[in-house]
Amino acid sequence: MRLISLTLLALRRLANQRALTACLLLGMTVAVAIASAIPAFVSSAQNRVLRRELADRTAGQIRLSGLAANTRLPLTFKFSYLGLGRALLSYDETLDLDAFMTERIAPRLELPVVRTVRYASTDPWAILPANETWRRYPLDDSQPLGYGSLDFITDLLGHIDLDTGRLPAGFPGAPEVTDDGEIEVMVGRAFSTKTGIQAGDMISLTRKDTVRVAVDLKTTREVQREYNILARVTAIWAPKNRNDAYWIIRPEVLEQDLTLSPEMMSRRISKIVERQFSLMIWSYELDDKALTVENVAGVVDRANALSVEAFEKNEQLTLNQFEMISALRNYLKRSQELILLMTLFCAPIFAVVLSFVVLVAGMVVRQQEGELAILRSRGASPLDIFYMYAAQGALLALIAVLIGVPLSFGVASLLASAITFLQFSPQPEWVTSLPPVSLRLAVAAAILGAAATLVPALSAARRTILGFGAERARSAGRPLWQRAWLDVLLLIPCAYATWQLRQAGSLVVFGTDVSQADPFKDPIRYLLPILTLTAAGLLASRFVPRLFGLLAALVSRIQPLTPIFLALRDLARSPKDYAGALLLLIFTLGIAAYGASLARTLDQHLIDTIYLDNGGDLRLIEVGISNKPDRQPGIPGQAAADDTEPEYLIFEPPEGHLEIEGIKRYARAARIPVRARNAGNRRNEDKSMLLAIDREEFARIAARGLRDDYSYAPMGEIVNRLATRPDALLVERRFFAENGLTIGGKFVLDIGDFRAAGPVTYTVADAFDVFPIVAGSEADYETGNFFVANAAYTFERMGKELPYDIVAETDPAANVEKMVQDAQELGFIVINAYDSRSKILSEQQRPERQGLFGALTAGFLFMTALTVLGFAIYALLSFRRRAIELGVLRALGLSEGQTSIYVIGIQGALTLVGALVGTTLGVALSYIYVPAMQATGKLIAPVPPFLTRMAWDNVALIYFALAAALGFVIAASLGFLRRLRAFEAIKLGAV
């Protein structure tokens, strides 16, 4: 009964403070939504990764099958029986295997089966014209028209069209199979075109088999048997869509075979040839939408078990999808890693959300301190008080789960649609399902949020009416973490780890390097700045009261600033009252400044890297036509080779690229292997690269990839040095210094291309550190030497043109495949194309990158909203708590205007100091930790170097939000102040 009474009391207390209860519920709901969204996002992102990985692994399959490059291969398990001419099956044995697959394999594939396709084929038969058909062929009747297998495949009629004729007997709508009728088959259009066979023709099928028969009880001998079958071709068929995933055997292969019905095979063919089937395939297309992080391990284990069971049934029966199983294993591993990474990436969000919950819970407790003290004085135990708050937390946690889980669909879609910081894909990725682990994490987050609400209640539960009065009299006590020096203890390991990261580029714990090669998969690099910010923020909050005290001392003797002095003195004397709000401001501004700057730096570095590699929007790798085409040995009629004639290439005029729709301008960029000669005219054996360019157009096209920090001077000026003279040469600055070169000096490069070997003399015009195409990630930056020269002069000195790339500026809406096709139609031989925009988009869609940027975006939005809301609530409630002080000040003679300045001073000073401290720490973290993201990364290119970019515009958004909240709070406080009288303030303050 007592517990029921306490529960009802807890519910009434929640109802009486609806605003604070709603804020608590909001914080817990956000925590639940984020926790539940992480597995849903991971499942959605990794499903896309799986599709892409399967597509990459089956690219060879697509090429071999002749399917279109954009064909989607579904998640399919294929079991096959391959007799290879030795272990041929009879028709009854095929039925036995088919029953085994239907009863034992298909129902146990873990995922729903969308489509099943079964295929059976015999060894090839020689096909000859028969009866009257041979008269149409001027060939010796002993020469076969071709070779083809007898086969059948399920669901064929839904995927073919009949050019002529009717379906063979046994198919739906065709005559029934009879024991004495003709054997009827149909052939593909390709076979008909090749051989001239038409519907209605009679053909003869011949095959010879060697079988071993018993001579007596001890010996056997080989006997050759010949089989002959007469068959009528009743139809010519063609596939409706050659790129349909239905075709488990290439349509081009099936068109060369003879297709008949299973009934014809069983009733007629099997009576002539007992053992004939050499190939059978069972293809099970699975519902990949049902594949989740939870069940992928079961799918892999079940596939392995079924493969073993199939082998036990027949040694020739195997599961062919080894690459599929490998892809699923990678999917499982990466999904588990990504869940952990996303949890760690979202840790700052959880920290701020829990801080918000603790802050609001503390406000709730402070509003109820008087009631709690009275309850304790009237006999309630600390356990009763704790139970009331636990009941409140449990109820809020339950409601948060009910609201937060549906909201997690939106949060997961937000994460999945992020392509960079605060930018989303124009076609959002909607997450429509939650894996079971989402519910478990949602419950865990709700429990954690409920536990956070109990933290402020622990001390209040021990306080009686006397302790409450003493506590209200002065709030100068230091928080527990300050008394325990937690901030300093946390800052020491952070400082040591930071020193390691800055010095060695990696983190070493107990002699073990814990850093990862890919920073996107290295949460330590992301958590270290957050931990450092936490320690620095806690440490800074120690000195904020002293700062307020110092400022109060400075203005204490200035009479007009008396309200400001009083405000600063109150802030200096009662740090415990605003410690939570101050830390929330510091953490939010610090994390926002660091996170936004990290996101902008990573995003711009990706763009810089790709444009450094490509040189422009599009780079076409082209070759010319040699004057010495390859000659095949043994083929008569070829002209004799003239070994004395030099080889050269014939190119289409490059101006033709401007005729391609989408190309705005172009420039030639030839990558020519060279060897440099040093000051003693001795050849340097290091492999080097010369980039011969059309200077003027190249400078315009590559402007986006030319950063001024790529050399000691702006890169635009460096490139323009090539215009000073035709033989001008730009030299890598490292090589320039090591070899004692001088501007204006002559320098010789030995052309290494076999088509134009020989020295070319240049004049050194300037030096650079990094240059597009040659000094990007495609080149060996650590050991190679790179040079840049004018293409016209280089080709002239060589006496010919060498293969060059075309670097182009393109229309953003242009289709790259269409441009390549147009170039080929104009006669350009394009062997490859690199599109910068497509590459950027592909990299932005990496799950790890999406997860990081999605977490940064979601964290920025949620933390800003919660911090602004929490600060506004704190400010309004603190004003009510200061009502007695305001009444006393009014009674002592402060005017309404001076009291207003006092209120504005308290709120404004706290907001300004918290925001400035947080921003300062965020900026410092950006310049300390952002460059370390590039230290050991393989997927973050070492060239170009990181250029830390501060996202001041994003930080300004938080300042605007805080300013708006501060304005609202001040307006509300002043409105309340105007209606407040001294005796009412004292009465209110005593409540």
What positions do the PLM features span?
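Small-residue-rich transmembrane alpha-helices
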Residues: 358-361, 370, 394-426, 436-465, ...
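N-terminal Sec/SRP start-transfer signal
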Residues: 1-35, 471-492, 541-589, 878, ...
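Membrane-interface segments at loop-to-transmembrane junctions
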Residues: 382, 386, 390, 427-435, ...
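Interfacial "coupling" helices/loops that link adjacent transmembrane helices in transporter permeases
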Residues: 17, 355-397, 463, 468-480, ...
